[in-house]
A protein has these predicted regions:
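Collagenous Gly-X-Y triple-helix signature in extracellular proteins
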Residues: 1-187
Length: 187
């Protein structure tokens, strides 16, 4: 069993039934991303691009976190993570959000692009396109190529959501073996 701090950026590990990619150690914890999308969902069922109100945010920090714990994750290992909700056009009206599990921002996509595993479909980011009420449904997304775009928040048929595992402290990590189960996976 290895400690998370012993892994290098880009290394993969299993935790709570999900395979994760280590990004970097930050303060008392480590920033990680699910190696594959965990389920298909709308960003927000009411078509709002504000992460603070997002139905996906509620699910990631509710049922999905519960599923990770049911698969053996320690709930106390998930530390609070503050996300910057600055819109693509520079508006800062939404401020920040604090979560245990969140999506990547556009800034995090760019910063960790070299070690982010490619996926077969586009994924949500939490960055709004704008905070202006006339277009408050647009949310940024990233394609498997790494190119960024935007989609309406209600769209969930093809949009898959990689969960950002906030920070983890003092975790024992087991090497990945064979086929894995993913917590919270939709049928």
């Amino acid at each position: 069993m290895k400690k998370l701090a012993e892994l290098k950026p880009g290394d993969r590990f299993m935790y709570g039934g999900v395979e994760w990619v280590k990004f970097e150690d930050i303060g008392a914890g480590t920033l990680c991303l699910a190696a594959e999308p965990v389920f298909r969902r709308a960003f927000d069922e009411e078509n709002c691009n504000d992460w603070r109100k997002s139905s996906l945010r509620r699910e990631l920090n509710g049922a999905f976190l519960d599923a990770l714990v049911a698969e053996g994750a320690d709930r106390a290992a998930f530390l609070d993570w503050e996300s910057d909700l600055t819109a693509d056009d520079g508006m800062t009206d939404y401020g920040t959000a604090v979560d245990k599990i969140a999506l990547r921002s556009d800034a995090l996509c760019r910063k960790y692009r070299e070690i982010t595993p490619p996926v077969d479909e586009w994924c949500w980011n939490l960055t709004p396109w704008t905070c202006d009420a006339s277009a408050s449904c647009g949310v940024r997304s990233v394609y498997s190529s790494g190119a960024m775009d935007w989609n309406d928040a209600y769209y969930g048929y093809m949009g898959r959501s990689p969960a950002l595992l906030s920070e983890i402290c003092n975790l024992g990590i087991y090497p990945r073996r064979g086929r894995r189960r993913r917590a919270g996976r939709a049928p």
